[in-house]
Amino acid sequence: MAPKKDKVPPPSSKPAKSGGGKQKKKKWSKGKQKEKVNNMVLFDQGTYDKLLTEAPKFKLITPSILSDRMRINGSLARRAIRELMAKGLIRMVSAHSSQQIYTRATNT
């Protein structure tokens, strides 16, 4: 049997990497500030009328959706939903401790 020859890897075309140079230190980024929303805490007549006409036409009604679209705060949105329920303009789809879902009242 002939002795084994040591295989030498072919020279690569890439230059050899130099030792780990000092990298630039990463700077701390400034935290993003959330924009403060200035929602109403009491209904004025215009917003109340808008609530009674537009909200029953929404396909999905939640306190967060009312708060966003009507520019009212969350507790006012929950009160508004209770009033719309009492008038029979909307109906409940699902209720959970943290989220209530309503929809427009249909004739069913």
Swiss-Prot record:
Residues 1-36 are annotated as: Disordered. Keywords: Ribonucleoprotein, Ribosomal protein. GO terms for molecular function: mRNA binding; structural constituent of ribosome. Residues 22-31 have a biased composition (Basic residues). Pfam families: Ribosomal_S25. InterPro entries: Ribosomal_eS25. GO terms for cellular component: cytosolic ribosome; cytosolic small ribosomal subunit; plant-type vacuole; plasmodesma; vacuole. Belongs to the eukaryotic ribosomal protein eS25 family. This is Small ribosomal subunit protein eS25y. The gene is RPS25B.
